[in-house]
From Swiss-Prot:
Membrane topology classification: Single-pass membrane protein
Entry's localization field: Membrane
Cross-referenced PROSITE patterns: IMP_2
GO cellular component terms, A-Z: membrane
Regions that span the bilayer: 11-31
Binding residues for Mg(2+) 2: D167, D170, D293
InterPro entries, A to Z: CysQ/Inositol_MonoPase, Inositol_monophosphatase-like, Inositol_monophosphatase_CS
Enzyme class: hydrolase
Keyword Metal-binding tagged: yes
Keyword NAD in record: no
The protein's name in its UniProt record: Inositol monophosphatase 3
Signal peptide (residue range): none
Organism of origin: Xenopus tropicalis (Western clawed frog)
């Protein structure tokens, strides 16, 4: 007998069961719909909002700019005081001394600790080794410059998806030769391996270029590029092979600029208000190159509609190994696919490691 003397008929039991199943169906279908929507959206899912496990990319851009500037002050101070304390920390891929100076070390210390003190959870890869006891109390004042506020909206991403790449002094060889126009400090932010924020700072002129993918920038591409007879920019340290192959591909009269520093070379493709900045249409590098040398430039080019790829035209991912073994080809305002196709006929598309 049912409680309180209520007798349930078979029909009543059936109705009750159907109602229960209906409630469960709606709850579960709502859950599945949410999961399916998230799957479809993928990376386009809504901003997760502020939280302990997220970072605002606008803030990260601001601290990256500040880090590049602070590092630049150290670089300039050391050079002007002529207290470089130059030494070799190994060999480059071309067999030359891989030089390090006090400028590299002090810039690295400021840049690394500014970012880590502001965002302790983030993974930061840097060219110079950071000792566990080598701390710096430098802190970010949380100030976001007006030009960033005006262009960039708040956007939160998961902290674990971020990898940062720092080059505290790009073009160290030229720095020791007092060819300071080539010198830059650089910061890059990659999300899930893709470069989305880039900062390139020239310490000796005070010029800073920054850009954020799907956001804004402080720099723009030039009004025109020469696709018929492009000017190429290559490294000073191993220009022989690149010049030969480039002229075989594009003609013996092709103009080729030899320059120091990957940051400087990327800026040569853009509209830079600096009388000492050379201009080119295409940047080529045929040997191994470290990711902290190229990540910032890659992010800036991506944000402005340009491309930086391996010599095979493959996307460069900024996770895992610090080494990009595929060489690189960078352009903007050009048909990048055509460049890859032409060069692949002449270049050894698997960038080779030179004999030491």
């Amino acid at each position: 007998m049912a409680p309180m003397g209520i007798r349930l008929s078979p029909l009543g039991i059936g109705v009750f069961c159907l109602l229960g199943l209906g409630v469960l169906y709606h709850v579960y279908s709502g859950f599945l719909t949410g999961k399916f929507s998230a799957f479809l959206l993928g990376d386009r899912a809504e901003d997760p909002g502020p939280g302990e496990d997220t970072v605002d990319l606008r803030e990260l851009l601001a601290v990256s700019v500040r880090a590049a500037e602070l590092g630049g002050l150290e670089v300039k101070k050391v050079r002007e005081s002529n207290s470089l304390n130059e030494k070799a920390k190994g060999k480059t891929m071309e067999g030359a001394d891989d030089k390090m100076t006090s400028g590299d070390v002090l810039s690295n210390k400021k840049m690394y600790h500014l970012i880590k003190n502001a965002f302790p959870a983030l993974k930061v890869n840097t060219e110079e080794k950071v000792e566990a006891d080598d701390e710096d109390a430098v802190s970010w004042d949380r100030n976001i410059p007006d030009d960033i506020k005006e262009q960039i909206k708040t956007k939160h991403v998961a902290s674990e998806s971020i990898t940062m790449w720092i080059d505290p002094l790009d073009a160290t060889q030229e720095y020791t030769e007092n060819l300071v126009n080539y010198v830059t400090t650089m910061v890059c932010v990659a999300v899930n391996g893709k470069p989305v924020i880039g900062v390139i700072h020239k310490p000796f002129t005070g010029f800073t270029a920054w850009a954020m993918l799907d956001g804004g920038s402080s720099i723009k591409k030039r009004n025109s590029y020469n696709e018929k007879t492009p000017t190429f920019i290559v490294s000073r340290s191993h220009s022989g092979e690149v010049k030969e192959v480039t002229r075989q591909t594009f003609g013996n009269k092709t103009e080729i600029i030899s320059a120091g520093g990957a940051g400087y070379k990327v800026l040569s493709l853009l509209d830079v208000t600096d009388d000492k900045q050379e201009t080119a249409d295409v940047y080529i590098h045929v040997t191994y190159i470290k990711k902290w040398d190229i990540c910032a430039g890659n992010a800036i080019l991506n944000a402005l509609g340009g491309q930086m790829t391996t010599l095979k035209g493959e996307e460069i991912m900024y996770t895992g190994s610090e080494l990009n073994k595929g060489g690189l080809l960078a352009s903007i305002g050009m048909d990048h696919g055509v460049l890859v196709e032409k060069l692949s006929e002449k270049l050894q598309v698997n960038a080779k490691k030179p004999a030491k």
